[in-house]
């Protein structure tokens, strides 16, 4: 036991010891032998291994670790793995920026490639500034950088004190993850749950890839309404649009069927301005009479509503935007006039922004622009990781059915969600709203490089064209496989790309196709059947509320499609971290705080205290300039060490027994501690770590401020039943407090526990009420009454501007007879702590210090 306990250095000291001792290892054989009920399994969220963690990660992962430590102390065999989400766009972008490269699949592999910014910090993300390299070279760089990032992440998690079993890790780009992802996909295909379709697709022009509904976010953007005249037999028809550049792609005008203004036009045709194409006027219930002029143009494609109208009204496709976000060179066939084609030629090859400016000038010149554009701000769809608005292009993609167009599947997903215990419960409604609001099946193919290859080939017909309706699937035992480098079953590599041969699928899976299988990846699905049976269904899925629509929903979907069983029994959802202005912290807003410096400056226990002080689903403010809660947590951890050192300074009997606690004050403290144990246990059972911490902390300060002060003179005294009673009560309380705080303050609790115990506090049994319960409802009152009397004595000294160590010649305490009787039973303790020579009592309505006479210091001391 050190002379002066300190928090500094505890993370390294105990982190190393836990690793050496295997404190948190999951014993697979013992767990299988004990059965599923003896295991507590956690579907840990794999953080994206691309860059740095932020304070929000520390916040939510601490919540999970508190649960893991609590369950371990309850005697459960805790399966607490860690994964790294290291495939997908975030990794690709980081590699591009870090090494100054970009992937060009047409280039050959270059052995021993040295990227231009090897080990540097390239700030540019412009393709023009990056060296093009082959796909294989690019993937090698992705592998290299993610491994380094993961080492840094693990070091930070260890310093935070996560009780993860570091032998149970996986990477979403690792070989087993590839195999599992491809196996699950093949089964989706064979059951008809995964399919291909040529359809309008949300497209990010920067990354040149399709994007799923779950990856969208709205961002307010400046725009303008342009009032434009179409020409009909009865005269002009005015529409208002924010996208005049799509006039060449217009296929119809649409109005609400009940809008009397336009009912006479329904079934007629009008001519588009500038381009001179005849288009029909149609009716649809999604048209908004109160928006703009009440009649809108349908283009292929300006937004999702255009896609709905196009599909449901069976309209032609006249798409004009290419994969690069520029206007394609060939005009739609419907533009058949010389003037129309000349106008279109002015747009070809331009960006959407430039094309818009050109069309506005053409409209102004033709007289079809009415007035000037009216500036507005409106929400525009972006890929959540993208920088430019999404476009909609027609592409062939792979999809997985998700209930958007299958009512039976949608209802099964809703019921599956209702079978899970949500913490907090209102998060279930968000899940159901997402399921009910889906507009299309899950688009799972991505036109990227670093991801799980879609394990499919296509036969080529006599003309060398892919036969997409007859995909070639690999044997399950051949997985994992990359169709871009492995020949299709029944073919040789020489037949690749040849008529009558085959071509490999070049797309990769959406990263969520792998992340949606985290229970299977960690638990050994179709790799270790005994382990999977021991941990599945998992007890807990912890995560952030912002990825309900992605990670949580997709995991439920994959489980429903695979076996119809919910993958976990509990879902715990953390709130957001907000800045002092209550704005959500995010990388895009530039207000993210990285945790390494915070942990270094304040210590891990203090940061964990801040995180654990917030309930699930509740946002927490973080001010790096004045982290008040973290400072409170540090003070608490130091107090725990100091209290332990103080208590352990008293010699205690070799064995502790409740029967040795005979003094009413001591018994009162233990009975109140019993209530704390009961309440904290119930709170943690209900996934309310904040209430458990608050309950424990509140009584701990009462224990330190009142009880310790009241009994220390007796504990210091000569051996007697009263002295033994105090010391035994103190030791019992310390044992309970260290275990109660252990899930939140693991380093301080371990340090103090090891001063007088063998083994780790984190493998000790969670405190039980029976350990400290002395029985009797009256026992609780003694400490409360003595505490109030002590507060009165302290208050009187403070009012007299005297030190708390100032002796008291005499004090009179007034109060009800019952309270006075309690105080008289512990009068010696009160006299000692208050330094009171004479203590008298008198009847009164309320407990109070009626009179106090402080000892006057000698003249020379004044």
UniProtKB/Swiss-Prot annotation:
The enzyme's E.C. designation: 6.1.1.9
Motif window: 'HIGH' region: 47-57
Subcellular location: Cytoplasm
Compositionally biased residues, Basic and acidic residues: 120-129
Reactions mediated catalytically: tRNA(Val) + L-valine + ATP = L-valyl-tRNA(Val) + AMP + diphosphate
Example GO biological process: valyl-tRNA aminoacylation
InterPro entries: aa-tRNA-synth_I_CS, aa-tRNA-synth_Ia, Anticodon_Ia_Val, M/V/L/I-tRNA-synth_anticd-bd, Rossmann-like_a/b/a_fold, tRNAsynth_Ia_anticodon-bd, Val/Leu/Ile-tRNA-synth_edit, Valine-tRNA_ligase_type_2
Annotated PROSITE patterns: AA_TRNA_LIGASE_I
Residue segments, region Disordered: 110-130
Keywords of the record: Aminoacyl-tRNA synthetase, ATP-binding, Cytoplasm, Ligase, Nucleotide-binding, Protein biosynthesis
Motif residue range(s): 'KMSKS' region: 584-588
Signal peptide boundaries: none
Taxonomic superkingdom: Bacteria
Top EC category: ligase
Positions with a binding annotation for ATP: 587
Primary localization: cytoplasm
UniProt KW Amino-acid biosynthesis keyword: no
NCBIfam families, sorted: alt_ValS (NF000540), PRK13208.1 (NF009687)
Function: Catalyzes the attachment of valine to tRNA(Val). As ValRS can inadvertently accommodate and process structurally similar amino acids such as threonine, to avoid such errors, it has a 'posttransfer' editing activity that hydrolyzes mischarged Thr-tRNA(Val) in a tRNA-dependent manner.
HAMAP family for this protein: Val_tRNA_synth_type2
Family, per entry: Belongs to the class-I aminoacyl-tRNA synthetase family. ValS type 2 subfamily.
PANTHER family recorded: VALINE--TRNA LIGASE, CHLOROPLASTIC_MITOCHONDRIAL 2, VALYL-TRNA SYNTHETASES
Domain notes: ValRS has two distinct active sites: one for aminoacylation and one for editing. The misactivated threonine is translocated from the active site to the editing site.
Name of the protein this chain belongs to: Valine--tRNA ligase
Organism from which the protein derives: Leifsonia xyli subsp. xyli (strain CTCB07)
Lineage: Bacteria, Bacillati, Actinomycetota, Actinomycetes, Micrococcales
């Amino acid at each position: 036991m050190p002379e002066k306990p300190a928090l500094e250095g505890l993370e390294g000291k105990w982190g190393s010891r836990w690793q050496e001792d295997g404190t948190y290892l999951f014993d697979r054989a013992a767990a299988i032998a004990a059965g599923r009920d003896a295991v507590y399994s956690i579907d840990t969220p794999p953080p994206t291994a691309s860059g740095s963690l932020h304070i929000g990660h520390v916040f939510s992962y601490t919540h999970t670790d508190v649960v893991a430590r609590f369950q371990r102390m309850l005697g459960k065999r805790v399966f607490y793995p860690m994964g790294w989400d290291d495939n997908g766009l975030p990794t690709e972008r980081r590699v591009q920026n870090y090494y100054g490269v970009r992937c060009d699949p047409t280039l050959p592999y270059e052995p021993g490639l040295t990227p231009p910014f090897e080990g540097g910090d390239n700030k540019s993300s412009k393709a023009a500034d990056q060296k093009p390299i082959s796909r294989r070279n690019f993937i090698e760089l992705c592998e290299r950088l993610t491994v380094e990032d993961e080492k840094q992440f693990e070091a930070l998690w260890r310093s935070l004190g996560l009780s993860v079993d570091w032998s149970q890790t996986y990477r979403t780009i690792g070989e087993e993850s590839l195999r599992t992802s491809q196996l699950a996909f093949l089964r989706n295909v064979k059951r008809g749950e995964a399919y291909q379709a040529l359809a309008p697709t949300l497209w990010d022009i920067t990354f040149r890839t399709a994007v799923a509904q779950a990856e969208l976010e709205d961002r307010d953007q400046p725009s303008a309404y342009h009032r434009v005249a179409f020409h009909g037999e009865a005269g002009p028809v005015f529409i208002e649009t924010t996208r005049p550049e799509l006039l060449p792609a217009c296929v119809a005008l649409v109005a609400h069927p009940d809008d009397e203004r336009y009912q006479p036009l329904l079934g007629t045709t009008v001519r588009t301005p500038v381009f001179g194409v005849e288009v029909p006027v149609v009716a649809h219930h999604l048209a908004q009479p109160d928006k703009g002029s009440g009649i809108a143009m349908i283009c292929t494609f300006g937004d999702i509503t255009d896609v709905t109208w196009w599909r449901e009204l069976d309209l032609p496709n006249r798409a004009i935007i290419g994969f690069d976000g520029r206007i394609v060179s060939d005009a739609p066939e419907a533009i058949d006039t010389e003037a129309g084609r000349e106008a279109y030629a002015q747009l070809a090859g331009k960006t959407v922004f430039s094309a818009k400016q050109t069309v506005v000038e053409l409209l102004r010149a033709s007289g079809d622009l009415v007035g000037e554009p009216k500036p507005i701000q409106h929400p525009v769809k972006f890929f959540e990781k993208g920088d430019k608005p999404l476009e909609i292009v027609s592409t062939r993609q792979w999809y997985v059915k998700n209930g958007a167009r299958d009512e039976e599947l949608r209802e099964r997903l809703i019921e599956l969600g209702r079978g899970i215990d949500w913490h907090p419960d209102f998060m279930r409604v968000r899940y159901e709203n997402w399921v009910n609001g889906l507009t299309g099946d899950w688009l799972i193919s991505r036109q990227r490089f670093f991801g799980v290859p879609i394990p499919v080939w296509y036969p080529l017909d006599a003309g060398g064209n892919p036969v997409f309706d007859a995909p070639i699937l690999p044997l399950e035992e051949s997985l994992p496989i990359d169709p871009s480098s492995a020949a299709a079953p029944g073919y040789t590599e020489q037949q690749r790309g040849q008529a009558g041969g085959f071509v490999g699928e070049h797309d990769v899976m959406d990263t969520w196709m792998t992340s949606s299988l985290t229970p299977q990846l960690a638990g050994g699905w179709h790799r270790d059947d005994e382990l999977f049976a021991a941990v599945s269904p998992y007890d807990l899925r912890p995560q952030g509320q912002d990825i309900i629509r992605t990670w949580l929903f997709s995991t439920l979907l994959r489980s429903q499609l695979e076996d119809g069983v919910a993958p976990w029994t509990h879902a715990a959802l953390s709130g957001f971290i907000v800045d002092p202005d209550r704005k959500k912290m995010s990388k895009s807003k530039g207000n993210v705080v990285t945790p390494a410096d915070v942990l270094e400056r304040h210590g891990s226990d203090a940061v964990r205290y801040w995180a654990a002080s917030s309930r699930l689903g509740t946002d927490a403010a973080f001010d790096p300039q004045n982290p008040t809660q973290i400072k409170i947590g540090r003070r608490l951890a130091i107090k725990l060490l100091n209290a332990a050192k103080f208590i352990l300074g008293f010699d205690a009997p070799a064995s502790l027994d409740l029967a040795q606690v005979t003094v009413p004050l001591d018994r009162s403290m233990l009975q109140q501690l019993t209530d704390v144990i009961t309440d904290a246990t119930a709170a943690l059972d209900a996934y309310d770590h904040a209430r458990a911490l608050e309950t424990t902390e509140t009584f701990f300060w009462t224990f330190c401020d009142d009880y310790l002060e009241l009994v220390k003179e007796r504990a210091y005294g000569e051996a007697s039943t009263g002295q033994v009673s105090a010391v035994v009560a103190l030791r019992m309380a310390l044992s309970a407090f260290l275990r109660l705080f252990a899930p939140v303050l693991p380093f301080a609790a371990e340090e103090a526990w090891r001063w007088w115990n063998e083994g780790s506090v984190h493998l000790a049994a969670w405190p039980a009420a029976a350990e400290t319960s002395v029985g009797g409802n009256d026992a609780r009152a003694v400490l409360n009454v003595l505490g109030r009397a002590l507060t009165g004595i302290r208050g009187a000294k403070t009012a007299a501007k005297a030190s708390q160590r100032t002796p008291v010649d005499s004090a009179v305490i007034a109060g009800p007879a019952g309270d006075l009787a309690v105080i008289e039973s512990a009068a010696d303790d009160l006299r000692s702590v208050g330094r009171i020579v004479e203590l008298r009592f008198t009847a009164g309505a309320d407990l109070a210090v009626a009179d106090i006479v402080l000892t006057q210091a000698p003249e020379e001391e004044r």
